[in-house]
Design a protein with these regions (language model features):
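Active-site nucleophile elbow and catalytic-triad environment of alpha/beta-hydrolase enzymes
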Residues: 72-90
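Acidic catalytic loop of the alpha/beta-hydrolase fold
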Residues: 70, 105-109, 136
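Short beta-strand/loop motif that positions the catalytic acidic residue
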Residues: 94, 100-102, 106
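Hydrophobic/aromatic beta-strand patches that form the interior of the parallel beta-sheet core
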Residues: 11, 99-101, 128
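Catalytic active-site module of serine/aspartate enzymes centered on a nucleophile-bearing elbow/loop
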Residues: 124-158
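Helix-rich cap/lid subdomain of alpha/beta-hydrolase
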Residues: 22-63
């Protein structure tokens, strides 16, 4: 958000502003120690893939996808830490009307942190929470509701 960007509308689904599961203290400490000397060192993410969607086929496809990595480098970890803080601090600078979509049972990201970020927005905004839905809303039982919310937001006046 350093350079001016003209956006008509923004749609954000399950933003990673904080993870929705505890990161072991030893991983955080190791990432801090290793970052300057071995930034490419990687750790397993520890995601519970059964929490991506209520549809077991989503987990199966995720595991079979050769482009999906189950690890994160310490460089990427620290970049994400800084980006999360930056996104939270700069929330009031977002001026485009913003739609936030989250599943209430998302355990991949922190829904509470997403709602806190949403509360910092000063632009026109709407938050749609999908009760019982997991992380990948577009692959969950609420898919049609999500598509309607996106369509309605995209076509809304203003």
């Amino acid at each position: 958000m350093d350079a001016p960007v003209s956006l008509h509308r923004v749609i954000i689904q399950a933003p990673l502003l904080e993870v929705g599961f505890p990161i072991p203290g030893w991983k955080k400490a190791a990432a801090g120690l290793l970052a300057p000397m071995w930034p490419t060192c990687s750790f397993r993410l520890g995601l519970d893939l059964s929490k991506l969607s209520h549809d077991p086929a989503v987990e199966t496809a995720y595991r079979a996808d050769p482009l999906v990595h189950q690890a994160i480098s310490v460089r990427t970890y620290w970049s994400l830490q800084h980006a999360k803080v930056d996104a939270f601090e700069r929330a009031p600078a977002l001026h485009a009307p913003t739609l936030l979509l989250c599943g209430t049972d998302d355990r991949i990201i922190s829904v509470e942190r997403a709602q806190q970020w949403f509360g910092r927005l000063t632009c026109p905004k709407r938050c749609v929470m999908f009760p019982g839905a997991y992380h990948e809303l577009h692959h969950d039982a609420v898919r049609e509701e999500v598509m309607r919310a996106v369509r309605d937001w995209t076509l809304a006046d203003g």
